[in-house]
Amino acid sequence: MFIFLLILFVCILLLPSCARADESPAAHQRRSLQSLHDAFSSAANSQYAYSIAHRLATDLHLHNNATYGGRQAGSDAEHAAADYLADEMRRIGLSDVEKAAAKCDKWQFNGASFTVNGTEYPVYTYATASTVPEGITAPIVYVGRGTMYDYEGVDVKGKIVLVDIDQRADWWITYPMLEAEHQGAAAILAANVGGFGQIADDALNSQDICGPTSIPTCSIGVRASREIRAQLPHGTVLGTLKVDNTVEIGKGTTYNVTGRIRGKSSEFQILLGGHYDTHFWGFQDDCCAVGLVLAAAKAMLDIGFEPENDIVFCLHGAEEWGSSYTQFDWTVGAWEMINTLHPEWVGKTLAFLNFELPAYEFATYTTTYSAPEMFSLLRDFTTRYPYTPKPQGCFPDGVLTEGYQTYTYSDDFSYYAAGVPSTVNGFLLQKDMEHVHPFYIDYYHTQYDTPDTYNDAVMAFNLRYYGALAIYIDQMPALQLDFTAQYTRLKDALDADIFAQSGADAALYRSVVESLLPPAQALKARIDTLNARYLAADEAGDIAEMTRLRQAGRPLIRKVLNAFRYCQKYLLGLMYERPIVPHQAPQETIALCQHIIDCLVRHDPATAVDQYVATVNNCLESYSIYFSPAVIDTLNDMNWGAGNQDNLYFGTNINFDKAEVEEASRSVYQRRAEIGGDFAKEIRVYRDAIDMEKKKLRADVHKETEAIGWLKDLLG
């Protein structure tokens, strides 16, 4: 009897530990993929996401100006928001919460006004100069679109110029601003007559400036501009412009706010992010993204999710603007994060899932932009994985998966260029990847980006869909990067005729590219097979097999991350803002210059101007056509000046080399109506440019051919 009681007593003592074992993290390893996804979808709370976004967009303590908002890089409001977000991360239970300090230029919009004949008109600034406290009182002069031709016969020295601008069809505010400064104006006000801010005639707009601080530069509503212009024919009209705008070069600090859910292993990680700096109130752009990221974190924590890898949640500062005197002045916080603060994240990060404006229904469908190597992953996750959420109450045509190349307009590109596989929800371009969604013409970067634009069904879907994508990437034993997409990209970049004209070895290039396909296909097959077997083991509840497959997948993960980093280092170029294979820049320029020459030889400058001249150097020759050489000198120095090469951010080492055709572009445009003119001088400029571009093409192709050969070995 004593022995029986002793055994019973020992069993009773052991019972609590047995119960704890069932509730321990080890228990979560036995949760099936279906139950994991079901639990996350149930816990994903779009209303929590909305509450975060709403506070960020409406709390005046988190904005620099009580009337129009604004939370610019390095500003007091951005710092206050960083504190709030770090506190919220701690409150919901994330670990290792940190405000990672990064360098930026500081911009803080405190306020501005423009008064004409006793009427005060609202204005909003760019990251440009302030006025003295008492303001600038000066005559107002209307100069059309603000090109150098609009100033002919007009004296604007010391005056305030008023221009119309369409920053989509024509040019960025930078160029009329620099032209106004060059012409001696004291300040410039721009009315958005097209392109942006079309939601209302009192809409104001702000953008990154892609230039120096220059002169005071403000957006003014179209209605206000019309009222002021109506007074000008009746005599001199004085205006008083007051701008309280802090722009401090090299003196700013932005914070990237991070927290994490620690995985069973910290060798690799998955990153979810958005940015919290804003123009105006920025509810969609990008307060909603911050809400989504924190809601995903909270849902994972609430279900006790123990990932295989670390899940890092990173809210970036200084996305909208972060540096003066550079073409690449946006996504500065993210660039600093991956290149300066955490370069070790390259080769460690399985994916960066970035978010922009995730609570607005842009179209009847949605997409994901990504690195080409991720097209297959996204397609399989969306169309073949059994646990992927489907849109409900939004996007009736579903998620399109044809593959959409990530662009330069969001933080994910900084990570992508550094070598991190990256995505962003389809927020900007329509499926043709050429035209923007109407939201960008109407609401984007205006005071009308408010909670009134919120769509809960879209937020709920994006939260569930991308949260499930993060779980999918975490749970699969092998990272599904597909280098057959890189093969296709490289193959499609070949123009055999231009290669032949340039003396580049098209046959060798084609041969090396074709040699890339078999190892890329074989690697893809290995990854797909491993992941398929893992899914089968999960369905069968075979934990031992799942563990074995995970171990087998680790070397494959290291291999594909190494190859991905290599691809971006040697095979990614940038033509102004457009991702390319490096040789495509000279290849394209040669073709365009030859078309122009053909037109000029047959005395047809009008066709040359209408179809070709402005498109050389991506679009930069359109600026050469319309703005003074001094303005273009500033543009050239920002991009290619020897003293500014450490100020290029995501354009560092991948920006294209411009063809020197500026004088010819301007001359052909100015002579476009001539019939039978002699264009020998201009033809010579374009021919010299072709000769130089042929040299660049041969050099690029040589480097690429060598790099592709090494890539083939990395994949084998």
Task: List where the protein language model places each region.
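Bacterial Sec-dependent signal peptides at the C-terminal "C-region" and cleavage site
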Residues: 15-25
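Soluble metallo-hydrolase cores and metallopeptidase-like ectodomains found primarily
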Residues: 35-37, 119-153, 207-283, 294-306
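Second-shell loop/turn segments in exported
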Residues: 36-44, 62-76, 142, 164-177, ...
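Noncatalytic luminal/extracellular "stalk/propeptide" segments of secretory-pathway proteins
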Residues: 47, 54, 58-160
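Extracellular/luminal Protease-associated
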Residues: 75, 124-216, 401
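Acidic/histidine-rich catalytic neighborhood of metal-dependent amide-processing enzymes
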Residues: 168-175, 179, 256, 278-375
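Active-site-adjacent substrate-binding region
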Residues: 252, 358-488
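C-terminal non-catalytic alpha-helical accessory regions
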Residues: 464-465, 473-716
